[in-house]
Amino acid sequence: MCGRYNLTASSEAIVEHFQLLRQVKFQPSYNIAPAQKILNVVELDDQSRKTVNLYWGLVPSWSKDSKNSSHLINARMETVREKPSFRSAFKHRRCLIPANGFYEWAKNEDGKKAFHIHRQDQQLFAFAGLWEQWQHETETLYSCAIITTAATDLMQPIHDRMPVIITPEHYHQW
């Protein structure tokens, strides 16, 4: 499960990394948590990219109430195509979620120990994400979830799940 991450890169680095046409307005943070508005990169019809801020905790479009609904922060890659909460977003509304690292907690004899997982060079990368629009009468909510998968051998001692990471050469395919 991915429940905390960080994005500390500069606006300029994000523009360059994701080949954006406009400057990005966001607050760098070492502790991004569910229910916060987070930076997402979406691809437009002309294959250019732009950033949007979405609430982290996907509310399905068919949900009756945005406040009492489950806010789904993660979607399992193994079931994302079939689950009613995610299947439409998986087909039509994918996004990239910029990050510099994420946190996982491993159980040990003293309770839990936090690990910060990041690239060795500390550079940006992107989580695979889904976004959704929930609408009811005059209220509209845009929200997202991070897709997770089984942990790699390197990650397995810390946690059995990890975010799906998309490499830059696959951004357009995602």
Named regions from a protein language model:
Residues 1-174:
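Short linear sequence motif anchored by a di-proline
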